[in-house]
Amino acid sequence: MAALNDFETTLKEVVQAKRLSASKMTKLTEIALKSMEHDTKLVTILYRTHKSLPAAAKVSSLYAFDALSRAARNQVTKRGITGDINSEQGNAATFLLKVEGVLDGLFQDMIAANNPETKVRLSYLVVNLTCSFHGVSDLVLLAQSHLP
């Protein structure tokens, strides 16, 4: 559980900083990849933290989702990992499935902010996150219909 506490602390440092730090994002990614067996808890921490942030920090939170999803997708591809959403122990593939489950809520939250700068950044992240997931075409269409 110490790893999950480190993950949450590092995540908060990343999203509350004035600028994204590559070294902190790398540290966050390393902690997450070592803790994939706790996929549900990782996604819960990510989502809960995102929802609690002021609008200005939510874009950094989406960048964290993006970085972690890319790293998980890389592991899935390299190692041929498969995931069963109902398995007791998580892995990179089940992490992606669980992140996919909260994506709609993330995008709805960002769209509700109604900030033009946020929408431009969100459109960039939609493209990146689409590359990490399968079967999110409806979500992408929803997001694109609200973006510039």
Question: Where are the regions that the model predicts?
Answer:
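Eukaryote-specific intrinsically disordered, low-complexity regulatory regions enriched
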Residues: 1-148
